[in-house]
């Protein structure tokens, strides 16, 4: 028995002129459906689930940064991947997040149909909601296959987006320190 998604992938393969019963394609609808579910698994997660009580009391007020978090997502316009990295910083105000949870927050929002601008803001808003810090900074740098494989076909372009909340938005020196520490000036 095929899932609706498997049937749709089978129809898609046939629509482009391929024979879905060909040896190399027989199991492709099943594999593609499984991959698509995985790539969009973020819809079935919540911030509370991802945090899993890993928010801790802490006296630290110094900047916390996790940089070079690898990410991939699907562009909501063409369903093609964009691949890059995310840098997250925040200024604690009595609470910190378990280190791995920051990467999991990035992953939760990246595993949805996205535009990079929204992804960046969702990550920042989630950190803000999780620990109510004095500020949050998120920078995402990514290559978009929708721009590399089709359309203008530019292979080396990188899109950079940022979301700055609290002191990162209000204080240029705080923002500059973050950008310097992640290697962006």
UniProtKB/Swiss-Prot annotation:
Entry's Gene Ontology BP terms: one-carbon metabolic process; tetrahydrobiopterin biosynthetic process; tetrahydrofolate biosynthetic process
Gene3D superfamilies from the UniProt entry: 1.10.286.10, 3.30.1130.10
Listed name of the protein: GTP cyclohydrolase 1
Catalytic activity: GTP + H2O = 7,8-dihydroneopterin 3'-triphosphate + formate + H(+)
UniProt superkingdom: Bacteria
Entry keyword GTP-binding: yes
Biological or metabolic pathway of the protein: Cofactor biosynthesis; 7,8-dihydroneopterin triphosphate biosynthesis; 7,8-dihydroneopterin triphosphate from GTP: step 1/1
